[in-house]
Amino acid sequence: MNKKYVIVVFFLISILSSVLAQGGLKYRGFSGGMMIHTGYLKSNSFDLQTIQGNYITTSNVEGIPFGIGGSARLHFGKHLRVGGEGYVSNLRYGIQGTTASVSWGGVLADCVWELGRLWPFVGVVAGGGAMEHIILQDVPADDFVVENNVSYREYTFMALSPIVGVEYALSEKMHLTFKMDYVIKISNPQADFPSGPRFFLGFMFYRLDD
C-alpha cells in the first residue's frame, strides 16, 4: 500500500482514538439509510492480448461511476459510531460499452460532532469486495449472436476506505447526508482496479436517546 495512504489511515485512527479517550461510550441508539454516488475513477494501464498471447492494445479503466448502497450505525457516547456499509459502483467506458463493477463493503467506525444542525464526521471502513470487468473490443449488436474478442475478469480484494462528510439535520429523525470516500485496495494488486474519489448523497434515519 502506498505510504501516503498509510499516513491518511493512521491519521484517521488517531482521531478515533483521541475522541474515544474524551468521553464515555454509553449506547445512544442507531441510524441508517441509503445513498447514491458518483465520482471519478481511473486504473493503471494494462495490455490486452489474444488467446495465443498476441498483443491487441493497451487500455485502462477511466470514467464517472454511478452506484447505490447504504450504511447502518450504532451510536456510543457523544461521538463514536460503529456499524457497516456496502455499495456497488458501476462504470461504463469506451465506445464498445466496456463495463467495470466494484462491489464493496465492510465494518465502519467514525466520529461525529453535533454542531447544531450540521454534523460533520470522519472515519474509516475496513472490509473487502469484488471487481467484475467485462472488456469488449467490438461494439455489440442488439442480437443473440455471441460476441468475439471479449475478456471477462473477476477477482476479490481487501481494502480500507477513509471517509469524511457532513450531515444536515432536517429533523430529529432524518438527516440529509453528503460524504466522500476513497477505496484503497490492500491485497491482490491488479492493473485494472479503478481508484479515485467518490461522492455520496442520501438520507439517514435516526433513533437516538436524548
Task: Name each region found by the language model.
Residues 31-39, 85-87, 121-127, 179-181:
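Transmembrane beta-strands of outer-membrane beta-barrel proteins
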Residues 1-28, 209-210:
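Cleavable N-terminal export/targeting peptides
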Residues 74-146, 158, 168-170, 202-210:
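Gram-negative (and chloroplast) outer-membrane scaffold detector with strong preference
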Residues 28-30, 62-68, 99-105, 118, ...:
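Residues that define the transmembrane beta-barrel architecture of outer-membrane proteins
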Residues 160, 167-210:
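Predominantly the C-terminal beta-signal and adjacent terminal strand-loop region
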Residues 24-32, 78-80, 116-122, 156, ...:
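Outer-envelope beta-barrel architecture signal
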